Amino acid sequence: MLAARLVCLRTLPSRVFHPAFTKASPVVKNSITKNQWLLTPSREYATKTRIGIRRGRTGQELKEAALEPSMEKIFKIDQMGRWFVAGGAAVGLGALCYYGLGLSNEIGAIEKAVIWPQYVKDRIHSTYMYLAGSIGLTALSAIAISRTPVLMNFMMRGSWVTIGVTFAAMVGAGMLVRSIPYDQSPGPKHLAWLLHSGVMGAVVAPLTILGGPLLIRAAWYTAGIVGGLSTVAMCAPSEKFLNMGAPLGVGLGLVFVSSLGSMFLPPTTVAGATLYSVAMYGGLVLFSMFLLYDTQKVIKRAEVSPMYGVQKYDPINSMLSIYMDTLNIFMRVATMLATGGNRKK
């Protein structure tokens, strides 16, 4: 499941930002290309209209319709995706009000925090401290790579070599940091943690082409989303979202396939724009739900892990899922802000 999240994270900049310089984005209206499509007559449908032939579409026609550039259809697909995100935001806001105001009859984690032992509070505190540290190190790594032309050019290529190398680095760094025990080898564990954050910074580095002001806005929006959803997870019943594992796995598979499929289809086609919207907007809602799930999972793990057990509580491993959710949300919010701004021009 973690590998699928990495693919969803890695394919986003390679598919959205790099091709933006070579071909139109599905939501950025290129006036020259648009006028060319609008002014070029479709001989096939014009001929069929003149001779009055009415018959069902064949498989070839359906394929051509899916791969045909149509800015009007692409715009509608993008709008549907944005409305889907807006609906998810409304549901999240309603859940925040419902659980935050104490309207639920069940006891949430925030009520249980009063009777938590001190070691449970320390575990959760250290987990979120490492999360904040990972985000800060990732930002510093992204800035450093953006100011290194050789590394930045490599990350911006979007070739299969670049994707393969970065994906291998992400998986390798993730496996390394998870495999080292926190209590027995604190030094190597923290070095692996630094390496993992640096590698993820390289993945985020292509976002710097969007500019500092937009990324700061995206960071604030992401902080609001993460803070609001974390509050919902804390106020909701302690196992309310832990039962969403199977549906979230299905949704992750759908976003995973859409992310891979969007790499092979041009974003200016109906099929490519549909896959892009599923990976972008569906992914934003999906990883927001994952954040609810992972937050309650961290709390549950901090509560049930024995203090003197054989396997000690690992705050670094515990925060990795929330960290990946946060990065996926941030990259999609930044992309939505960028494409939304370009669409208004």
Curated annotation (Swiss-Prot):
Residues 1-45 form a transit peptide. GO terms for biological process: apoptotic process; calcium export from the mitochondrion; calcium ion transport; inner mitochondrial membrane organization; mitochondrial calcium ion transmembrane transport; mitochondrial potassium ion transmembrane transport; negative regulation of release of cytochrome c from mitochondria; positive regulation of mitochondrial ATP synthesis coupled electron transport. InterPro entries: Bax_inhibitor_1-related, GHITM. GO terms for cellular component: endoplasmic reticulum membrane; extracellular exosome; mitochondrial inner membrane; mitochondrial membrane; mitochondrion. It is found in: Mitochondrion inner membrane. Residues 104-125, 181-190, 235-244, 293-345 are mitochondrial intermembrane. It catalyses: Ca(2+)(in) + 2 H(+)(out) = Ca(2+)(out) + 2 H(+)(in); K(+)(in) + H(+)(out) = K(+)(out) + H(+)(in). Residues 46-82, 147-159, 212-213, 266-271 are mitochondrial matrix. Disulfide bonds: none annotated. One of its GO terms (molecular function) is calcium channel activity. Pfam families: Bax1-I. Plays an important role in maintenance of mitochondrial morphology and in mediating either calcium or potassium/proton antiport. Mediates proton-dependent calcium efflux from mitochondrion. Also functions as an electroneutral mitochondrial proton/potassium exchanger. Required for the mitochondrial tubular network and cristae organization. Involved in apoptotic release of cytochrome c. Inhibits the proteolytic activity of AFG3L2, stimulating respiration and stabilizing respiratory enzymes in actively respiring mitochondria. Belongs to the BI1 family. Interacts with LETM1. Interacts with AFG3L2. This is Growth hormone-inducible transmembrane protein.
